[in-house]
C-alpha cells in the first residue's frame, strides 16, 4: 500500500549545507510568445481561475472556449507585439520582473543565506518552478512577495492559492510568509510621488491634471467584500496629500474592464473622452497599482487612452512609467522584504 501523501510530487533535491531563506517575487503573468497560440495558452490559464472569473459554470466554459479563445488571442497578440521586447523575445513585464529580482538579490548579497527568485502567477516561470528552485537551494523558509500594492482576491489571494497548492504536494514543506498589501506604505507613496515629480520635470508641457488609473474589477466583487476599491482610494488620497493637490488635480479612475458586467467607476477611457470634451488639453497618467510596466500600461494607457484623449480634442498626453526596477521602486521592494524577513535574518 502506498504511503505517499495525496497528489504528492517528487521532493526537490536539496543542496547540503546551511539552511537558507528564500524570497519569491510574484507578478501576474505574460504569454511566452506574442502570437495567437501563445496568448491563447495564457488567456486560458488566466480566465480559468475562479479568483478572476468567479462563475466558472458551464455557460462561462462555453463562452470561454467557444468564443473568447477563438477570437481574442488574435487581437491581443497584436497588442503584445506593439510592446514586445524583441531583443529578449519576451514581454516587458518579464524583463522588468527579472531585473527586480536581480537587483533585490544584489541588495541582499551581504546576507549569503538569502536566495531571491521570481515567478508569474500565470505563464512562465511558474510559481511551482520558483518554489522548487528555492527548495533546491536549501531554503527551508520562503517569503512570497505578491507585487500588488492593493489587495484583491483576484491578484494577491490567487498567488497565495497557488503557493499553497504547490506546498500541498510536498511532504517536507518550507515555512511560509507572505508580504501584506502596501497600498499606503510610506515608502511606496514616497516612491510614487518622486516618480511623478521626476517625470513631470522632464516634460515640455505642464499637465493640467493627473489621472491615477488602477486596474478595474467587477463591482460585484467589491459588493461581496473585496477591499480593492478601498485600497485604491487610500493610495490616491495618500498620494494627494504627499503631492499637495486636491481631488480635482489627481483623479482616480479604473481601466481594463472586460465583459458586460458593471465594473468599478469612473472608467479611465470614458474619463479621457470626457476631460478632452470639457476642454482639458494637457494631462499625465500614473498607474499606481502596477509594480512594473506591462500591456495595461504600455499599450492600453500610453497608446490606446492617449489616442482617445487626442481624438476628442486633447493635445498633450504623457504616461508616467511604473516604479519598475528604478531606485525608488527597488527601495519599496527592499523595504517590504526586509520588514517581513525580521526574525529570519
Swiss-Prot record:
EC number: 4.98.1.1
Main location: cytoplasm
One Pfam family from the record: Ferrochelatase
Residues annotated as binding Fe cation: 215, 296
Alphabetized InterPro entries for the sequence: Ferrochelatase (IPR001015), Ferrochelatase_AS (IPR019772), Ferrochelatase_C (IPR033644), Ferrochelatase_N (IPR033659)
Keyword field contains Metal-binding: yes
Example of a GO biological process term: heme biosynthetic process
Subcellular location: Cytoplasm
Pathway info: Porphyrin-containing compound metabolism; protoheme biosynthesis; protoheme from protoporphyrin-IX: step 1/1
Catalysed reactions, as listed in the record: heme b + 2 H(+) = protoporphyrin IX + Fe(2+)
Cellular component GO terms, alphabetical: cytoplasm
Molecular-function annotations in GO: ferrochelatase activity; metal ion binding
Keyword line: Cytoplasm, Heme biosynthesis, Iron, Lyase, Metal-binding, Porphyrin biosynthesis
HAMAP family from the UniProt entry: Ferrochelatase
PANTHER family reported in the protein's UniProt record: FERROCHELATASE, FERROCHELATASE, MITOCHONDRIAL
Family listed: Belongs to the ferrochelatase family.
Task of the protein: Catalyzes the ferrous insertion into protoporphyrin IX. Essential for normal nodule development.
Official protein name in the record: Ferrochelatase
Naturally occurring in which organism (per UniProt): Bradyrhizobium diazoefficiens (strain JCM 10833 / BCRC 13528 / IAM 13628 / NBRC 14792 / USDA 110)
Amino acid at each position: 500500500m502506498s504511503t505517499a501523501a495525496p497528489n504528492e510530487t517528487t521532493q526537490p533535491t536539496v543542496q547540503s549545507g546551511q539552511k537558507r531563506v528564500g524570497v519569491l517575487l510574484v507578478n501576474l503573468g505574460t504569454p511566452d510568445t506574442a502570437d495567437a497560440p501563445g496568448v491563447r495558452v495564457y488567456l486560458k490559464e488566466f480566465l480559468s481561475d475562479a479568483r478572476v472569473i468567479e462563475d466558472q459554470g458551464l455557460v462561462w466554459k462555453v463562452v470561454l472556449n467557444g468564443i473568447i479563445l477563438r477570437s481574442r488571442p488574435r487581437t491581443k497578440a497584436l497588442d503584445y507585439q506593439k510592446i514586445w521586447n524583441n531583443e529578449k523575445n519576451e514581454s516587458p513585464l518579464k524583463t522588468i520582473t527579472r531585473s527586480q529580482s536581480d537587483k533585490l538579490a544584489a541588495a541582499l548579497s551581504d546576507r549569503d543565506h538569502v536566495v531571491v527568485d521570481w515567478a508569474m502567477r500565470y505563464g512562465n516561470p511558474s510559481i511551482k518552478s520558483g518554489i522548487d528552485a528555492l527548495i533546491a537551494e536549501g531554503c527551508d523558509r520562503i517569503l512570497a512577495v505578491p507585487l500588488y500594492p492593493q489587495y484583491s482576491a483576484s491578484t494577491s489571494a490567487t498567488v497565495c492559492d497557488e503557493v499553497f497548492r504547490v506546498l500541498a504536494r510536498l511532504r517536507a514543506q518550507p515555512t511560509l510568509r507572505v508580504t501584506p498589501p502596501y497600498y499606503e506604505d510610506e515608502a511606496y507613496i514616497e516612491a510614487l510621488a518622486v516618480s511623478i515629480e521626476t517625470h513631470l520635470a522632464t516634460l515640455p508641457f505642464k499637465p493640467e491634471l493627473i489621472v491615477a488609473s488602477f486596474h478595474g474589477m467587477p463591482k460585484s466583487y467589491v459588493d461581496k467584500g473585496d477591499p480593492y476599491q478601498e485600497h485604491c482610494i487610500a493610495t490616491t488620497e495618500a498620494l494627494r496629500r504627499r503631492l499637495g493637490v486636491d481631488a480635482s488635480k489627481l483623479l482616480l479612475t479604473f481601466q481594463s474592464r472586460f465583459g458586460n458586467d458593471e465594473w468599478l467607476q469612473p472608467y479611465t477611457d470614458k474619463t479621457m473622452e470626457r476631460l478632452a470634451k470639457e476642454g482639458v488639453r494637457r494631462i499625465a497618467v500614473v498607474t499606481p497599482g502596477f509594480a512594473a510596466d506591462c500591456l495595461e500600461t504600455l499599450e492600453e494607457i500610453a497608446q490606446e487612452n492617449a489616442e482617445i484623449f487626442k481624438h476628442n480634442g486633447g493635445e498633450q498626453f504623457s504616461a508616467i512609467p511604473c516604479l519598475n526596477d528604478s531606485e525608488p521602486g527597488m527601495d519599496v521592494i527592499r523595504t517590504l522584504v526586509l520588514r517581513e524577513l525580521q526574525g529570519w535574518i
